């Protein structure tokens, strides 16, 4: 998630983000996520898309045991934490400035025997991708990463690098603006995309994407 500190006047209706702790129950664990809206803005609060994607993972929609997963723009790390609790080997990523905060949440919410399953690592989309092996991950996770149009090209480049032909991408988002739909159109040029879940209460969609078979494009 991008780091955008917000003025108090812009946060009307967002009181839940100002709470220092957000508590959830996933995978038979109580998870307490520390939030810090004033210092780190959107990167340091739990958005509904992260909650819905975590619920979707808990439903067993994808096999996580033995799975190599990466969370992009992790922010507070909720999705990556849940994936690790459910058996995945997870690399939880965000920009350098957010890593200390992210790591503190991951370490606070994973039991010692599960902590080796979660690695916090720096990743700025489109930069230094060589630090990750091409097609390294079985599953790529992103919650509310589609909102800054200037990042779309870098995000697509990053997805393309991290995916193999068999990798699955799960993106959870709320379609707020036309630009959000525009990203999905851009995604469809490189990936086969389908909507696999919708939470009407939180108005969050989950999209599944996989690299297009070259034969499909002939």
UniProtKB/Swiss-Prot annotation:
TM annotation in the entry: none
Protein's UniProt keywords contain Metal-binding: no
Keyword Methyltransferase carried by entry: yes
Xref: InterPro entries: Methyltransf_16 (IPR019410), SAM-dependent_MTases_sf (IPR029063)
Location relative to the cell: Cytoplasm
Enzyme type, top EC level: transferase
Record-linked SUPFAM superfamilies: S-adenosyl-L-methionine-dependent methyltransferases
UniProt keyword annotations, A-Z: Cytoplasm, Methyltransferase, S-adenosyl-L-methionine, Transferase
GO-annotated biological processes: protein methylation
Molecular-function GO terms, alphabetical: ATPase binding; Hsp70 protein binding; protein-lysine N-methyltransferase activity
EC numbers on record: 2.1.1.-
Main location: cytoplasm
GO cellular component: a single term: protein-containing complex
Residues the entry annotates as binding S-adenosyl-L-methionine: 47, 73-75, 94, 125, 143
Annotated catalysed reactions: L-lysyl-[protein] + 3 S-adenosyl-L-methionine = N(6),N(6),N(6)-trimethyl-L-lysyl-[protein] + 3 S-adenosyl-L-homocysteine + 3 H(+)
Entry superkingdom: Eukaryota
Similarity-based family: Belongs to the methyltransferase superfamily. METTL21 family.
Its job: Protein-lysine methyltransferase that selectively trimethylates residues in heat shock protein 70 (HSP70) family members. Contributes to the in vivo trimethylation of Lys residues in HSPA1 and HSPA8. In vitro methylates 'Lys-561' in HSPA1, 'Lys-564' in HSPA2, 'Lys-585' in HSPA5, 'Lys-563' in HSPA6 and 'Lys-561' in HSPA8.
Record text on subunit structure and interactions: Interacts with heat shock 70 family members; at least some of these proteins are methylation substrates.
Record's protein name: Protein N-lysine methyltransferase METTL21A
Gene: Mettl21A
């Amino acid at each position: 998630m991008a780091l955008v500190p917000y003025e108090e006047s812009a946060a009307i209706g967002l009181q839940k983000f100002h709470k220092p702790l957000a508590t959830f129950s996933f995978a038979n664990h109580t998870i307490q996520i520390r939030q810090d809206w004033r210092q780190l803005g959107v990167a340091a609060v739990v958005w509904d898309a992260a909650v819905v994607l975590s619920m979707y993972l808990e439903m067993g929609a994808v096999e996580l045991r033995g799975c190599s997963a990466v969370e992009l723009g992790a922010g507070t790390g909720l999705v990556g934490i849940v994936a690790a609790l459910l058996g995945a080997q997870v690399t939880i990523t965000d920009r350098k400035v957010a890593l200390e905060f992210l790591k503190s949440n991951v370490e606070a919410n994973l039991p010692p025997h599960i902590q080796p399953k979660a690695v916090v690592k720096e990743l700025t989309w489109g930069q230094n991708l060589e630090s990750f092996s091409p097609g390294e991950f079985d599953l790529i996770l992103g919650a509310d990463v589609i909102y800054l149009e200037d990042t779309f090209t870098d995000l697509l480049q990053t997805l393309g690098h991290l995916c193999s032909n068999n990798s699955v991408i799960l993106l959870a988002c709320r379609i707020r603006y036309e630009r959000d739909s525009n990203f999905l159109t851009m995604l469809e040029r490189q990936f086969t995309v389908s909507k696999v879940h919708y939470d009407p209460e939180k108005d969050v969609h989950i999209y599944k994407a996989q690299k297009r078979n070259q034969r499909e494009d002939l």
